[in-house]
């Protein structure tokens, strides 16, 4: 039946699974089944580093089978609904109800309807209060878990903060309680109380939240004893010891970020007022260079990818960036592996850094002024020196780059018309420098 369906949809590679480096787990022999759900298309979800990390962590546990669910595209969804066929996992073609957990990555608010759609297509009651022991426990994590209340009716648990350690503690609690829970000897609320002892876990049904007339939280208190009065955000203290996937899954179709992603740091030392990511990933931590090189070497040998992206909120603030680039270039000098960076701060490219990057990849560099006037940059607390930026842009063009990308935000508080006009002016200045260099 699946082969018949795949002949009728665009990009059937989204639904076949069986990628290179896929862990071989026997679903039926696993004591605990975890559905890892990403509420968007396959090619977006497989570009998400968090999904890859949690997937590797859980499948490294001998008694756990972690399998992936992604939102189907509209053509696939229509066929599944017309045939009254539920959504299924990529690995074993199992339905969502056959799992102990359904864990959702909540990356942005626009995916919330996809969360509900996946639950509905998996024949799971949407409201947590309607789900007994026969249904999977629904967990939410990721950036949007910082504000869980809009989804509190639908989730049994939220994991506030970073999941690498906490998910193991959740699994360990469930491992010890599963038989009693599934036999209805243990009530669901009692199990949730046990989960609430894990730092970072918020079980909405254990708390009462009151709102004022404007919809803001007025009071937050526990309904029962034995649960934390406040939920603390969970974070890793040592990024060097954090698990990272070495057996990088290689999809059969092109995905959004079709390369190896190396997380070299987490958190950010800057304090831009517009940024949600800084409090989400606070405090600032970095990996040691030797650790990064080992991860890069392992990922390359297991994949053959010819591009690696250094990942972090502000990679240019990584101390030792120049040394890291030199050693990465030396490591892969015989393999033609290119190294790419996200948006960089101009001052980080002073010296040899821009030339190093240009020696391995000249497709483009990205800068993020965010606002084109100094007045507005001060309001959002964006550290960006215009004179320094223009000098670096000229240096970048001299290094061999032909394209740079500039990020700006529109709609900031206290924005004026002249702030928008200045975007054109700043972009033109950068363009004129390229013309000057190329004369």
Regions found by a protein language model. Give the residues of each.
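Conserved SAM/AdoMet-binding glycine-rich loop
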Residues: 36-37, 297-439
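Short hydrophobic segments within beta-strands
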Residues: 37-39, 69, 105, 141, ...
């Amino acid at each position: 039946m699946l082969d018949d369906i795949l002949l009728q949809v665009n990009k059937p590679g989204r639904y076949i699974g069986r990628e290179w480096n896929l862990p071989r787990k026997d679903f039926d022999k696993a004591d605990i089944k975890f559905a890892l759900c990403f509420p968007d298309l396959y090619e977006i979800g497989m570009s998400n580093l968090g999904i890859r990390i949690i997937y590797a962590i859980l499948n490294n546990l001998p008694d756990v089978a972690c399998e992936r669910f992604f939102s189907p595209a509209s053509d696939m969804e229509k066929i599944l609904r017309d045939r009254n066929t539920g959504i299924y996992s990529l690995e074993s073609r199992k339905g969502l109800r056959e799992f102990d957990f359904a864990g959702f990555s909540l990356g942005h608010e626009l995916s919330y309807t996809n969360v509900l759609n996946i639950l509905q297509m998996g024949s799971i009651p949407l409201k947590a209060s309607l789900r007994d022991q026969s249904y999977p426990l629904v967990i939410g994590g990721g950036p949007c878990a910082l504000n869980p209340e809009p989804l509190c009716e639908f989730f049994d648990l939220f994991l506030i903060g970073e999941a690498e350690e906490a998910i193991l503690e959740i699994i360990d609690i469930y491992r010890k309680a599963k038989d009693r829970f599934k036999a209805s000897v243990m009530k669901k609320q009692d199990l949730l109380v046990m989960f609430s002892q894990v730092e970072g876990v918020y079980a909405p049904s254990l708390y009462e939240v009151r709102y004022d007339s404007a919809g803001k939280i007025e009071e937050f208190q526990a309904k029962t004893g034995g649960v934390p009065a406040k939920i603390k955000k969970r974070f890793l203290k040592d990024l060097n010891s954090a698990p990272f996937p070495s057996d990088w899954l290689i999809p059969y179709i092109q995905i959004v970020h079709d390369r190896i992603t190396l997380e070299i740091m987490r958190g950010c030392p800057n304090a831009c007022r517009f940024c949600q990511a800084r409090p989400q990933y606070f405090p600032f931590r970095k990996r040691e260079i030797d650790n990064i090189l080992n991860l890069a070497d392992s990922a390359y040998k297991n994949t053959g990818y010819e591009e690696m992206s250094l990942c972090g909120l502000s990679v240019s603030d990584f101390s030792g960036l120049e040394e890291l680039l030199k050693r990465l270039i030396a490591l892969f000098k015989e393999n033609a592996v290119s190294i790419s960076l996200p948006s960089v701060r101009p001052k980080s490219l002073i010296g040899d850094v821009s030339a190093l990057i240009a020696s391995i990849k000249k497709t483009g560099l990205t800068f993020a002024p965010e606002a084109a006037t100094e007045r507005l940059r001060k309001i959002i607390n964006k550290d960006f020196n215009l004179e320094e930026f223009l000098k670096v842009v000229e240096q970048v063009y001299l290094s061999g780059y032909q394209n740079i990308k500039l990020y700006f935000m529109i709609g900031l508080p206290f924005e004026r018309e002249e702030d928008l006009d200045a975007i054109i002016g700043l972009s033109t200045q950068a363009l004129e420098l390229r013309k000057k260099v190329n004369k």
